[in-house]
Amino acid sequence: MKRLKAYLKDGINVAAVMCLGDTISQFFFDKKSLDEWDAGRTLRFGIVGLVFVGPTLRRWYHFLESRVPKTYSPMRRGVTKMLVDQTLFAPPFTMAMSFLVPLSNGEPIDRIRQRILDSYLSILVRNYMLWPAAQMLNFRFVPLGYQVLYAQFIALVWNCYLSMILNS
């Protein structure tokens, strides 16, 4: 039960930040008025955070913690975790998000496939402009129990970008 609560807590935190990111994206980047705001889109983006992003990140960070030797210096552990995260996790996670967000908005699979072909590489390149440094700080200085929350503060900016690209 304690483990379920931890997953739920992370899922709720991630959902809230993703909803905020989508709302910011709609108002500031899409220039929508309050009457034009697509609350359903915001809710769907948040649900992806609740059921996929939060639990996935929690599991991934615990996996990294268990696999990177604790005998490494703190700096080496942080660098190792960041490199593994950005090489093994970021590409498939980005692909999953590129699929799930449009799917949650009811886009047909053929359109999602084309969207991925058109935007996946540019999203991944931009991922590498932000996340390696952010994750290095996360894995080096943030205690394991707070790593998902820390990542979500960084993700507020990232989610605005993702929402803008994946909901266009």
Curated annotation (Swiss-Prot):
Localization per Swiss-Prot or TrEMBL: Mitochondrion inner membrane
Family: Belongs to the peroxisomal membrane protein PXMP2/4 family.
Keywords: Membrane, Mitochondrion, Mitochondrion inner membrane, Transmembrane, Transmembrane helix
Subunit structure: Part of a larger complex that may be a homohexamer.
Role according to the record: Non-selective channel that modulates the membrane potential under normal conditions and oxidative stress, and is involved in mitochondrial homeostasis. Can translocate uridine, but not orotate, across a lipid membrane. Involved in maintenance of mitochondrial ultrastructure. May be involved in mitochondrial DNA (mtDNA) maintenance but does not appear to be directly involved in mitochondrial deoxynucleoside triphosphate (dNTP) pool homeostasis. May be involved in the regulation of reactive oxygen species metabolism and the control of oxidative phosphorylation.
Name listed for the protein in its UniProt record: Mitochondrial inner membrane protein Mpv17
One GO CC annotation: mitochondrion
Keyword DNA damage: no
Gene Ontology MF terms in the entry: channel activity; monoatomic ion channel activity; uridine transmembrane transporter activity
Site (Determines ion selectivity): 85
Keyword Membrane in record: yes
Disulfide bridges in this chain: none
Organism: Drosophila melanogaster (Fruit fly)
Membrane-protein topology: Multi-pass membrane protein
Phenotype upon gene inactivation: No effect on lifespan under normal conditions but reduced lifespan under stress conditions such as starvation; adult flies show an increase in glycolytic flux. Reduced mitochondrial DNA copy number in the fat body, but not in skeletal muscle. Mitochondria in the fat body appear swollen and lack inner membrane cristae. Conditional RNAi-mediated knockdown in neuronal tissues results in significant defects in learning and locomotor functions in larvae but no defects in adults.
TM annotation in the entry: 12-29, 41-61, 82-101, 144-166
An annotated GO BP: regulation of mitochondrial DNA metabolic process
